[in-house]
């Protein structure tokens, strides 16, 4: 896995739920989750397993991908991960 790249990731918790997040060091972040020092949501649902990761050139795009994913229902989330879809930010064109 790539280090120090901005990424959006999804882990599956022990109860079967998904947790999506952003990091720039995926291995360290998964370790933090599994040590109980990660997000409050995952602390009560250990262990977590990495299910999906997307690398982005910048933090903004990775966080937009995370936000987009969180708006989907479970079926759509599973389809997104299975297809290996990649979030592509749409840029607004200036009319000036």
From Swiss-Prot:
The name this protein goes by in its record: UPF0213 protein BA_0032/GBAA_0032/BAS0034
Domain spans labelled GIY-YIG: 4-79
SUPFAM superfamilies: GIY-YIG endonuclease
Pfam families attached to this UniProt entry: GIY-YIG
InterPro entries (UniProt xref): GIY-YIG_endonuc (IPR000305), GIY-YIG_endonuc_sf (IPR035901), UPF0213_domain (IPR050190)
CDD domains, per the entry: GIY-YIG_UPF0213
Highest taxon above the source species: Bacteria
């Amino acid at each position: 896995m790539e280090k120090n790249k901005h990424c959006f990731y999804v882990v599956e918790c022990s109860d079967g739920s998904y947790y999506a997040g952003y990091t720039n060091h995926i291995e360290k972040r998964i370790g933090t989750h599994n040590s109980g020092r990660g997000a409050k949501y995952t602390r009560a649902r250990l262990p977590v397993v990495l299910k999906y990761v997307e690398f982005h050139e910048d933090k903004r795009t990775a966080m937009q991908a995370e936000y987009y994913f969180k708006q989907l229902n479970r079926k759509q989330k599973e389809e997104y991960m299975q297809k290996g879809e990649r979030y592509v930010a749409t840029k607004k064109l200036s009319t000036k």
